[in-house]
């Protein structure tokens, strides 16, 4: 049975999106070369969809610049959208060695890249370290050019409060683009929230994530929430904290006084400062922060407090930590798709693709 047909029986995506995804993947993989696409009638037979849905599929692909439709002749692959043969792409990721989330994303990119005739060259952590310390961008670009790298998946350094870091992230992305290397941002932008850069960006809806974290704790009986993050003023923190505030305001809960705490989770003085607010619910930037903070908190205080993290790392499952699971596989697949589109001379405005994170409730918020 056709994979898209199977997906329609099990997926919540609209049927036209599932069929469009299937056709798009084949176009980018070169299966249609520069030839004619299936007609509306052929799509109806192949996927068991209505005529209106088939028309919407072709209209969607046309709006993306992948196909052109000729009156009386049908739909054809846009010559500018054909994926380049055996193009090379690479990664430039600040946190590759410290978060399993990015490892999962890169694995997904590698799997999907092959379907788009893209060859992935893994970027070394050392490369980002050199660039983040004002290493020569010219040298990095020269290495990319020598390796025939046409595109880079870029996760910027996560410290937007530091002006030097913010400017360096922007300089890296803009220099690569100026030198003819396509950039797709993953997880975070190169400008402070709520601003958006003019690069394609794939990640989760961080405002929604903070909202879901807070709403879950409120549903579990919490009324005094605070947000706990590390010392760096990162793009994702500001977005998620906004989401938490939205949830508090929606539920008529107090938002006065300090609600956002940044610090070292292993520092007793920081933990005490947070707990002096007498919170009954803690929202953490990610699970690692929750594990470190609660380890210190449990030594200092006998009272219990409910909490939730984000990322759903392997330790969280064993420790019973409620979390939000980011769809790493889909983020990687979408990043690869956007890269293939851009390398195929796609000229649509910059895209921001945001996924929802899945709530995984466990003992830390549910009790027991």
List each language-model region with its residue ranges.
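Minor-groove-contacting beta-hairpin "wing" of winged helix-turn-helix DNA-binding domains
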Residues: 38, 73-80
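N-terminal helix-turn-helix
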Residues: 36-69
